[in-house]
C-alpha cells in the first residue's frame, strides 16, 4: 500500500499518501506507544464513529498521552479524509503514537502524532442482505 494514490490526514493536514512517513526510531514503533481504531463506512456513513473515537481517546489516556486534537476534530477529519479520497464504502484507520524525540522506556517528552488513513473496502454483504 506504500505507493497508493490518495490522501492521508496527518497531524491536521491532508498530505499525499506516499508522503506519510515516520522515523525508524519512533517510540510508538519500538515500545508500542500507539493506539488505533478500525472503522467502516457504508454508503458514506461511518459506523459508530463517536464510540470508536471515544475509545481511541480512552486508549491514549491508558498509555498516558493526550491526542492533540478533540474528539470532534478527529470525527470531522475522518469524514474529510473519506470525502477527499472519494470513498463511501471504506475502511478508516485513525492512529496516534509517540514520536522519535527520545528512545527509552519513559517518553513523556515525545510529541504525539495522529493520522487517519482510508481505503476502499466494499461491503461483505449484498444490498438485500444488508436489509435483513
Q: Where do the protein language model's features map onto the residues?
A:
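Conserved alpha/beta cores of soluble small-molecule-handling proteins
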Residues: 1-132
Amino acid at each position: 500500500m506504500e505507493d497508493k494514490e490518495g490522501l492521508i490526514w496527518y497531524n491536521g493536514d491532508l498530505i499525499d499518501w506516499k508522503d506519510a512517513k515516520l522515523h525508524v526510531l519512533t517510540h510508538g514503533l519500538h515500545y508500542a506507544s500507539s493506539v488505533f481504531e478500525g472503522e467502516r463506512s457504508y454508503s458514506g456513513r461511518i459506523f459508530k464513529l463517536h464510540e470508536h473515537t471515544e475509545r481511541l481517546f480512552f486508549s491514549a489516556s491508558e498509555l498516558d498521552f493526550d491526542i492533540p486534537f478533540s474528539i470532534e476534530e478527529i470525527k470531522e477529519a475522518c469524514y474529510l479524509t473519506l470525502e477527499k479520497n472519494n470513498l463511501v464504502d471504506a475502511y478508516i484507520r485513525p492512529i496516534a503514537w509517540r514520536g522519535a524525540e527520545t528512545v527509552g522506556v519513559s517518553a513523556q517528552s515525545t510529541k504525539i502524532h495522529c493520522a487517519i488513513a482510508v481505503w476502499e473496502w466494499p461491503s461483505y454483504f449484498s444490498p438485500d442482505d444488508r436489509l435483513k
